[in-house]
Every structure is written in structure tokens, then in C-alpha cells.
């Protein structure tokens, strides 16, 4: 089987593709990953048992074409590979096009997306948000769910570190690069809207690289105004992220456009609920008040109301642990992913 990917950075989409490698190998496939360059995740594919070819010319459809036609089955990862899908549509090789993209990913690529797909192509997405983004430009495409699987980090032996952010208070964290669509400014405004006596009862942590100056400035101003309660950390190691998930009370994802935020899923692994924007893939899976909370309209005031409730009732969030774990096991566990991916591959290859 051949997997086509645009560059191989260490970010959500390639890491998720890595999780498909052992499943495909267990089905008897040899896995070859083809991308134009290595952005840092190449070793993850090799460790998972795949072969990897990086070649800048593989963006030229004819170059990837010959290899793809020799494969039993092709996974095309993300909407940026639309040209490859267009080239393979209508051929004899089964193609699974797996979408992880936000609405923001579409304007510059929409003209390359085929208007019709051949019988050999099936489209899958990591949830309703990613499907809605494609449906905004191709409403007639049939898109099925294929949510990524994450390992059960809570069952692993990792080096536990007391990160020191709790300070004996409920801790609410957000993790991810600082860009406008991630909505750090909305979270900052919500923290400012809290009554002072409520804000003082909690700690807030922002983790991520500063990609957007406006987002970073809003966090810097907040840490300057409330140095006892609001903290910023550029990056944490994988083990420190796991420690954070263990130590936090809950997570906050204020994104304006986010297909399926990985850190929210990591929180579920440790039984931690999140407060998320309706513009996240996670929102479509949450049962309000049972395994998380959803606010609407990118409204900091609505987020502040939910935050205040969570700060005043940390025991309520702690009691959601079982339901959060259930949500992970049902939708995001390696077992759930393997079951869905196997069924998708079998369905596609049976058509041959």
C-alpha cells in the first residue's frame, strides 16, 4: 500500500497517518510512504515499519503516478494532495482520501479538487468539522468518518514531572501553536471576564510556539497582568505533556476552526474533560456536561460562564473521568481506529 503525504512535519496529520501503518501491516500490506520532504516525522514512519521515500518531484503527479499504479491500495492524506486524487480517480487502484483539514486549508487548493470522483475513490474525514470544510466547496461528496487512534498514554510508564503550574488550584490548559484560528485571544478575553475572586482560584497555562504576533501579544499581556495565575510555556516534551494531562483539571480549546484537536483527545485519555468551541471536530462528539462542554459563536462571554462553573466546581469535572475515558475508548482508541480503518480498506479493495 502507498501513502501520499505533503511533506512530513511533526504535526497532527502525519502523526495520525503513522498510526495507520501497523494496522495496514497487520492486514498483510507492505507500507510505502511517499512525501516531498522530511519535516521531522520520517523516523516515526520508519519505527512503525514503513518504508519512506522523500523526493521533491513527487508533487509532480506523473512521478507519483507510476508508483501509485503499482500499489494494491493508496491512502492520500489531506486535501493538499488533491492533484494526486484527480490523477488516480477512475483508475484501477483503490484510493482512500483522508481529510484532516480545517476550513482555512481550502481557499488556495479548492480549484484543484476534482468535481467528480471515480468509483475507486472513497473520502473519509476525522470528524464532522473536516467533512464540513470539504462540503463547503464540494457539497455532493460522500464523506465517511475515520477518526484517528491514539495510544493509551495513561497506561504507559512515562517520567512523571510535577510541572508546578497548579499551585494548589484547579489548572486549565491549552496546547497548540499560536495562530489566529486557534483562538488564544478568545481564551484570554474569557479569563479577563471572570470575576477577580473566581480568577484567583484557578491557574491557566498556555503551551505553544508563537506563530501569530496578535495571539502571542494577548497571552503576554495576560501573563503580565496576572503573573500569579497565568503561565506561558513555549514547549513541553512528550512526557511533560502526559504529566500535564494528569495534573490539569480540564482543557480549553477556543479554536475558530479546528478539525480534531489532538491535545483535547490526549486529555480524554487521562479522563480530563474539555471546554471546546463549537468550531472543533470534538464538539460534535461531546455529550454536554457528561464528558465536556461546548460554547458557541466564538463568544468569550459564553466561555467565561463555563470556565467560572468549572473553577467553582472542580469536583464535578473530576467526576467526569469515567465518561471521558469512555469517549476516548469509543472514538479515539487504537482499537476503535483499527476497526474502522480495516472496514474501510476491506470495503475499498473488495471493489477491485
Model-derived features: where do they sit?
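Conserved acidic donor-binding segment of nucleotide-sugar-dependent glycosyltransferases
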Residues: 288-289, 293-300, 309-314
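Aromatic "clamp/platform" in nucleotide-sugar-dependent glycosyltransferases that forms part
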Residues: 256
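Conserved donor-binding/catalytic core segment of Leloir-type glycosyltransferases
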Residues: 3, 166-182, 188-191, 205
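Short, small-residue-biased leader/transition segments that mark boundaries at the very start
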Residues: 1, 6-8
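Short, structured helix-loop element that forms part of the nucleotide-activated donor/catalytic region
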Residues: 39-48, 203-228, 240
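Short alpha-helical donor nucleotide-sugar binding micro-motif in glycosyltransferases
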Residues: 68, 235-236, 243-248
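Short hydrophobic beta-strand element within catalytic cores of glycosyltransferases
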Residues: 34, 273-276
